Amino acid sequence: MTTREYDYIICGAGSAGNVLATRLTEDPNVTVLLLEAGGPDYRFDFRTQMPAALAYPLQGRRYNWAYETDPEPHMDNRRMECGRGKGLGGSSLINGMCYIRGNALDYDNWSTHKGLENWTYLDCLPYFKKAETRDVGPNDYHGGNGPVSVTTSKPGANPLFEAMVDAGVQAGYPRTDDLNGYQQEGFGPMDRTVTPKGRRASTARGYLDQAKGRPNLEIVTHALADRILFDGKRASGVTYLRGSERASAHARREVLVCSGAIASPQLLQRSGVGPGAWLKELDIPIVLDLPGVGQNLQDHLEMYIQYECKEPVSLYPALKWWNQPKIGLEWMLNGTGLGASNHFEAGGFIRTRDDDPWPNIQYHFLPVAINYNGSNAIEMHGFQAHVGSMRSPSRGRVKLRSRDPNAHPSILFNYMAEALDWREFRDAIRATREIMRQPALDRYRGRELNPGADCKSDKELDTFVRARAETAFHPSCSCKMGYDDMAVVDEEGRVHGLEGLRVVDASIMPIITTGNLNAPTIMIAEKIADKIRGRQPLARVDVPYFVANGAMARNVAKAVRQPETV
């Protein structure tokens, strides 16, 4: 078994790991080994590079770990999907490319936790800006020279996007021009991680492309981290597998775990760091009994509220195989056309109750009726809203099943375990129906296909949610930051009770953010990269941001149509 030595070893070349690899190797005197269990991000594979093909990677295992949950007790005991990215780019290689940073109050709320005072929104905003190049240029809220290409909505988009945003406004909710700017709350255009040439802007493209030629960075693909090695309480290296061969590497400074909210706690537990009782079940020598490793697991759950479209303007024809070669050719040659968009070009965030301090419901609008993973396409022109709650009080866990690094862990999100979950999902369905009833959609709106117009009572809505709600693919919080008894890392990602070991990815969020997780994960890695390098944090950006302060969630007086009596 060969052993080589580096300053830093990074386990996982995903949304966070690629940021760290790039930033740390800006110092030519620092050496980094980046380990990735998957393969390269093949630039000629349309499945990962074409934005419109986003469903394809979830349908196989080349780019997807394809985890599955244990039977979810509140979801008809369904085993539910938990897709995570595999390959350079991690989940940024297979996600929906929605660039959503979260609400300012997410971060202000984090900062109220002991030891996390420097995680306010104004502390985080400089790192969002540092990571971003927005196609319309920088401003107080956006960057213009970062590795992540962000594309904004353009003229000529599908008319259903504008109609759905207008319908939300007609229902009495705010309009916002920038879901990542002054005000997240409301309906408006959605930014996307797509390059100016119409390609997916994964962190492999944005970050690793500028770093992979550096002599102080070694990238090893098809390398599955097996265990973190320890010298007493100090992380000293990593053993990993390449096929049937085992290798090890020594870290002079630190081991950085960036394997995501499922695999990071799995790797820690396999290495002897986690709840002592769980480790004893598998006869794993305990390095540190750290009870929070794998606990506090959170996700976003969502539903598809689907309608028939009376006019032939949806993407339904693009689902037919005979139309796809033309779409693919235009995208391949010009980077334009239907293939160059993820087709999540509008959405929004609302509060369903006036006493909600910031939005608790997210919308993605889509001009076709189909599941996120490409299944269950409705055979007609249609459109839908993906809608789900943002900060469920339900908590799950990731638990090691086996010492075999190839074995998937036991995953239980414990979806819909709390009464608030059910209230929010009922509210969301009823609010969506009210939005869809507005005049802006009159020319397009046909029959309600799902849940169906006859599904009205609380009991009927709950039955629909149990049977049909799906993951939004946002697992997080399983190695949370903080200083309480269940915290795993401190405010800089350093694992409590150990030396030379950090976790840097979505697993360290203490509470899930309001929206998609790719942008916040990149920000977290940018912020902690400065800590690792011993650099002063970027100066806070003193800009205003919207706070509801008890304002009405919806201006009923301005609503064009009132809700039907149920």
Swiss-Prot record:
Where do the record's region annotations for Disordered lie? 183-203
Q: Where are the transmembrane segments?
A: none
**Care to name a GO molecular-function term for this sequence?**
betaine-aldehyde dehydrogenase (NAD+) activity
Pathway connected to this protein? Amine and polyamine biosynthesis; betaine biosynthesis via choline pathway; betaine aldehyde from choline (cytochrome c reductase route): step 1/1
Q: Which UniProt keywords apply?
A: FAD, Flavoprotein, NAD, Oxidoreductase
Q: Which metal ions or organic cofactors does this protein require, according to UniProt? A: FAD
Which superkingdom?
Bacteria
Q: What's an example GO BP annotation here?
A: glycine betaine biosynthetic process from choline
Q: Where is the active site?
A: H474
Family the UniProt entry places it in? Belongs to the GMC oxidoreductase family.
Protein name per Swiss-Prot or TrEMBL: Oxygen-dependent choline dehydrogenase
